């Protein structure tokens, strides 16, 4: 097909499918990270397209912190059963034994132990040499400077000053034993692109992205949804019921909702057309300290 005749979304789709197929052909043991969010749902859809009518030739991995929204876990299990892909779920056993949680230990320690260390454990356990992630360059400044093929050393760390050149659609996947590549097929997509593609392709998403009246508390400048009994009210707090939705999904105590009436995909797209901030402003882990996301990525975070 003539690239000049492709629409913007068709070009993005073709680029992403090309990257997914390249990794499947080039690496011995790839895996696709599955965080259950909108970007993961798009990436899963692209992987299914890339190998249709065959099955996805690599497993999907979810690093579970034990603090995800209940609706996310329900959606994860339902999706895995529906499409029949190989789903691996890993929880950091040491973190669970220590009782690590975001309320007692804070977002930074919780994220490091349950997410970063948990991810590195899983990658080492299964010996994956390439891992797909759904990060996009428009999300956050440290992600904006990361390559599509992001080299990681034997400790899974990232050095932004030691990245490989990428000329057009040519990628260097050469690694030594123990080294790996993080691969970001959605690098050139924007949040608006994601939502338009979800709408056009009729991709299923977690209902939390759609507005509904939900119980929340206002804490540290964020609207935190009361998802289970583990959220204890602090002095002066009270549960309110507001029309909210989420632009990004993570551990529920660390993910802020936005007040919104948008409960259909066209309404979400209308909101995105006038949005002036990144969806990651609702993630507490991005505000631990100046440059906190880049520091986390250097340590092995996605």
From Swiss-Prot:
* Enzyme class, UniProt record, top EC level: transferase
Q: What is this protein called?
A: Sulfate adenylyltransferase subunit 2
Catalysed transformations (reactions)? sulfate + ATP + H(+) = adenosine 5'-phosphosulfate + diphosphate
What is an annotated GO biological process for this record, any one?
hydrogen sulfide biosynthetic process
Q: Which family does it belong to?
A: Belongs to the PAPS reductase family. CysD subfamily.
Keywords tagged on the record: ATP-binding, Nucleotide-binding, Nucleotidyltransferase, Transferase
User: What does the UniProt function comment say about this protein?
Assistant: With CysN forms the ATP sulfurylase (ATPS) that catalyzes the adenylation of sulfate producing adenosine 5'-phosphosulfate (APS) and diphosphate, the first enzymatic step in sulfur assimilation pathway. APS synthesis involves the formation of a high-energy phosphoric-sulfuric acid anhydride bond driven by GTP hydrolysis by CysN coupled to ATP hydrolysis by CysD.
Gene3D superfamilies, alphabetized:
HUPs
The Swiss-Prot or TrEMBL record annotates one GO molecular function as: ATP binding
Residue ranges annotated as compositionally biased, kind Basic and acidic residues, are 280-302
Give the region (Disordered) as residue ranges: 279-302
The pathway is: Sulfur metabolism; hydrogen sulfide biosynthesis; sulfite from sulfate: step 1/3
* PANTHER family per the UniProt record, alphabetical: SULFATE ADENYLYLTRANSFERASE SUBUNIT 2
Q: Which InterPro entries match?
A: PAPS_reduct_dom, Rossmann-like_a/b/a_fold, SO4_adenylTrfase_ssu, Sulfate_adenylyltrnsfr_sub2
